[in-house]
Amino acid sequence: PVARVIVFHEAEASLGTTSRQWMELARHHLAGALPGTPFVGGTDGNFAELNRQPPDVSAMDGVSYTINPQVHLTDERSLIEAIEAQHDTVVTARGFCGALPISISSVTLKPPFNQAAREDEAPPDPNELPPAVDPRQMSLFAAAWTVGSVRSLSWGGADSVTYYETTGWRGLMETEQGSPLPEKFRSFPGMIFPVYWVFAFLADARGAAWLRLRWDQPLLLDGLAFQQGDRLGIAVANLQPRSQEVHLSPAPEGEATVRRLNEDTMAAASTDPASFVQQSETLAVNAGQVVHTLKPYETAFFEFKLV
């Protein structure tokens, strides 16, 4: 089924927001074939375009915009500092779209195209990565950053979020053919990228109640938590290129299991998902607390049994 139709006009999409006439035209031609499907408008550009030119929401069933953390700077610290701003974009958008659903479509590590271009650009160099491709897509850093992004947007109140692509160098796993430029994007055919496991964690929590975590160093760690029946699941991401000790409390008494996505387990996570899923460690809960050392850019998936 079609979840939603997002309407853009090619001449407006990247620099402004969807005009009422295009919303009405799309609805006129498509609504009969897609009964009950919401028609969403907004911008194919950044939140700045939406904020500068709020759309006529009376013609829309929802509002959409894109997010990427590399409009200005590309270093890891800047990308981490951009995580919290994602929450703020949703809160600001809520101010002019009211109760309409907010769809972030999509979230990417790099801008999908050059919004600053005012004329046709020269063809990309076939020996270089396309401008929209970040070689960190296949990295542990991307997985940790994505944990923070999901947390930030969900806490902000986004109704739906589309991330990345399914396969290829902007996706969750490599294609069967492999990277077109393996010397620049160092994946291998069929490789499962670390970010895949963040979405596996989310999929495993379908229908669960999501909980809020609190931490005292927001630029060092990020995380997600859910409760589903007697299961308590927590994903903790190390946002730093150094090891860090994390204390989880209050933790249910008994034992916890943890599956670690880090430099030691990445080989199995990338090639043998069945094996990686079985690579869990048992941790003791002492005085209502679990202590765990996260390796650089590690994402650790904890599970507790509630009694």
What are these regions (language model features)?
Residues 3-140:
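Noncatalytic carbohydrate-binding groove/subsite architecture in carbohydrate-active enzymes
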Residues 58, 156, 295:
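Structured loop/turn residues at beta-strand edges in well-structured enzyme cores
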Residues 103-196, 213-219:
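Aromatic/acidic polysaccharide-binding cleft in carbohydrate-active enzymes
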Residues 29-35, 91-102, 148-160, 202-209:
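A structural motif corresponding to the C-terminal end of an alpha-helix
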Residues 216-253, 258-265, 300:
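Carbohydrate-binding surface patches
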Residues 47-49, 71-73, 110-114, 168-172, ...:
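Flexible loop/turn segments at secondary-structure boundaries
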Residues 253-287:
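Trp/Gly-enriched beta-strand surface patches
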Residues 273-307:
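C-terminal beta-strand-rich structural cap/linker in extracellular carbohydrate-active enzymes
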